[in-house]
Swiss-Prot record:
Role this protein plays: General regulator required for the development of the entire plant. Regulates the duration of cell cycle. Probable activator of Rab GTPases and upstream regulator of the cell growth-regulating TOR (target of rapamycin) network. Might also control spatial growth in pollen tubes or root hairs via the TORC2 signaling branch. Involved in the regulation of abscisic acid- and calcium-mediated stomatal closure, but not in light or H(+)-pumping induced stomatal opening. May regulate microtubules depolymerization. Binds calcium and has a cytoprotective function.
Family to which this protein belongs: Belongs to the TCTP family.
Induction per the UniProt record: Up-regulated by momilactone B. Not regulated by light. Up-regulated by abscisic acid.
Any further remark recorded for this protein: Knockdown mutants have retarded growth due to decreased cell size.
Tissue-level expression: Expressed in flowers, leaves and stems. Expressed in roots and siliques. Detected in seeds. Highest expression in actively dividing and differentiating cell types, such as the meristematic and division zones of the root, the embryo or the elongating tube of germinating pollen. Expressed in cotyledons, leaves, hypocotyls and roots. Detected in mitotically active tissues such as shoot apical meristems, root tips, lateral root initiation regions and anthers, and in guard cells.
A single MF term (Gene Ontology): protein domain specific binding
Protein name, as recorded: Translationally-controlled tumor protein 1
Lineage of source species: Eukaryota, Viridiplantae, Streptophyta, Embryophyta, Tracheophyta
Family matches, as InterPro entries: Mss4-like_sf, Mss4/transl-control_tumour, TCTP, Translation_control_tumour_CS, Translational_control_tumour_p
Length: 168
């Protein structure tokens, strides 16, 4: 199994159980999330209630909740939204922090493609939910979530160069 960690913080952000599609010249990865139900399920199907802890029918256990699989699996933490000015400041800082951690070849690809990816993201800022890894570090790579037209499941966007592949 492959896990993809935030190159800047080490937080786990994705795994190969969630297939991705490269967009914006490979700068962004697009991953489909799904709403799932999680929680304790305690089902007793025997016909003898007195032998199954309790003499009365206790009804349904309401400790289940709906979550997005990617957010739940990697314990992503939602962040406040960004306006255009704040997002551009984030991107400038992100480029400055990430570039030295990349190989020379990856630096060239990243520098060439990040402008196009930023232009792709900017007009969609109001549609995004923003997430970072579990550690909630100030220097974290942002993960973007939005709903495509007519979809009930969110789509996530990751900066491909901000991920480090780790074999488990």
């Amino acid at each position: 199994m492959l896990v993809y960690q935030d190159l800047l913080t080490g937080d786990e952000l994705l795994s190969d159980s969630f297939p991705y599609k490269e967009i914006e010249n490979g700068i962004l990865w697009e991953v489909e999330g799904k709403w799932v139900t999680v929680g304790a399920v305690d089902v007793n199907i025997g016909a003898n209630p007195s032998a199954e802890e309790g003499g009365e029918d206790e009804g349904v256990d309401d400790s289940t909740q709906k979550v997005v699989d990617i957010v739940d699996t990697f314990r992503l933490q939602e962040q406040p939204t960004y306006d255009k000015k704040g997002f551009i400041a984030y991107i400038k800082k992100y480029i400055k922090l990430l570039t030295p951690k990349l190989s020379e070849e990856d630096q060239a690809v990243f520098k060439k493609g990040i402008e196009g990816a930023t232009k792709f993201l900017l007009p969609r800022l109001s549609d995004f939910q923003f997430f970072v890894g579990e550690g909630m570090h100030d220097d974290s790579t942002l993960v973007f979530a939005y709903y495509k037209e007519g979809s009930t499941n969110p789509t996530f966007l990751y900066f491909a160069h901000g991920l480090k592949e780790v074999k488990c």
